[in-house]
Every structure is written in C-alpha cells, then in structure tokens.
C-alpha cells in the first residue's frame, strides 16, 4: 500500500463532453433542419443560466415540466436521452451522428413538443435520441447551435449568469470586444486559432467541452509539419491512453501528447501559459473560454465576439495539466490516461487500473464512481486492480483543480 498524503484532483470535470454533427448519407435518412418556429419577433430576452462544473445549463419547459438542458454550441441540434424520454416526441426518421471521439452511428430523430426557453417558445424543434454517455449527471438534454443558426444572436455571460437572446440584428452593435468570423461545417461554428508559431487551424467552438482548448492528433501532426522543432518543444509528456467519452463510447487507446502552449491566439486575443493535450476528436475551443470573458455570437454576420473580463489584449491562463482521467471499462471506472510527470503516477496509479473500492465502499459501476461524494481536502484510500488481477491500495487527497 502506498501511504502518501497528496493531491486528489477530480478530473472527470475536464473531459471533453459532446460534439455532434449530422451527416445525411442518402435519401432514406432525414436531413438537418432548423426551420422551427418562434412565438415572438423583435424581442430581447435575458435568461438566467447555471454555470456548473464548467458548463452552461438552461431551464427548458416542455409540457408544463421544467428540464435542465446543456447549452452546447458543438451540437448541431438538440439531444434527448433514451433513458429519460420526453412525452409528446414524434418520430422524424433516422440521421447519421458523430460524437466527441469521432465515432459515427445512425440514430433516431424526433420532433420535440413545443419547448419554452425564457419567454421564447420553439415549435417543431428536432432532436436526436442518444444513450446517456455518463449516467448519474443531472442533465435532461442538450440545446444545440440550431438555436443560433435559426437567426438568434446570443450573449453568454457566466459572470452575471445570463444568456441574452435576441432576433434584433443590431442589438449588440455597440458592444466592444475581439471579433472573429466563423465558418459553418456540419452546421456548427469553426473559428481560426493559432496555437503555435505560424500554424493556424479551424477549430470548433464547442461549449459542450469543459476545456479551454483541445488539439486533434491530426492538427498536431500538421503543426509539426509546418513549424518542425518548435512544435516538438510544446510537448511536456506522452502517454498511451484515452480520455474522451462520447455517446458511442470512449475513444480508442492511442498516444496522447501533453502540451504546454506559451501563447494560444483566438479572436485576436492571446491566452498565455495554456496546458492541454491531444484528442482523437476535433480540435475545439471549449466552455472554459467563458471563465475569461463573455461571448457574443452573431449569426447574421457569422461572427463571434470575445469580451475579456480583464479588458486586456491577453489573458494568463496558468492552468494545471491533466494528470489522470477515468473512463468506463466494462461498466467499471478505469484509469484511461495518466501523465507520467504527475502526482497520481508517482503514487502508483497506472493506465488500465480498475477502481474497485474507495475506503470501505465497493465501487460497482462507473456511475457510482462519478457520483461518489468526494470532499475537498479529505484523504481517500483507493483499492485498484491491474490488468493481471493484482490489487493494491493508494492514498489520495482531493484538492480543487485550478
């Protein structure tokens, strides 16, 4: 048993969460639609939001019942879950869907009953039905980018816990900030970012992801091809593992690069001292951006405006590197990824370890692990089992990740 008092960081909160794009393949499949109707015009509405574990949640009313939906700009359309169906949904065919790991499948499409968000009611809004990727979380569904694609300008301001929606094209004309044009691919927004040197890439603006920035493996290869040794200098570690969980399962086992970006440029604004890693899914600029400023999306101009809270041309991020991540393996919590320079590795955690017990409590499912009532500052005794079936114990103390 390793008996060392150290930091236990709850890392599930930084896993990339959802990316959905819809790719019709033939006449038998339904097509993407955003022609739902609105009950109001010439309006401005301020909606109170929840900002929890680095994501934006909206109160949505359907059939007189209030639901809690994630606002995910990386999702082309709304999503509801098979294990908690919403009454009144009408089948609308099948559609091809791609998740955060790049996996694709054909899923059921439905038309939702009238949906009310603030003072706005949407009629004819479509949603896909998915299995819940991580059970035990209080999420009833997803509102996707079609809300904005429909023509509504939006301002996300987590400091004031507000989402402002309007159909007035000039409502935000006097707002100041750093603006960038976005391009729609598969009905979701991509902006150009500069992670290092002369390399630039189109990156998904994805509030479904909790991270500030994640770089696809393919993008890093392209970056290395363009700037050579300068790209290699970004690497602060390598590991064989997986960390992203999508609706169709966890990503496959592969090499993950741990990166330290001195300067990530987006919206003509510099984010300095950024720790991140590579992913098998899309490169993305995620919801952690909202920690540093408000964001305005203007669909009629196809522009996204970033308003830094510090009112400066650059922001120092200075975040911690992800040192361990957990994924489901056979329904149980498993160490999907571990950084060899991190504290969990020093304590004895290894990739592939299965968590079987915390203190005296047997862990029987990934859901139980995700919802375990950890307390910051308390030490826990983890019992883990490796691939050979050998068990060992590790003491680990949870502290809040900066």
Per-segment meaning from a language model:
Residues 25-402:
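Pepsin/retropepsin-fold aspartyl endopeptidases
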Residues 1-31:
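Bacterial Sec-dependent N-terminal signal peptides
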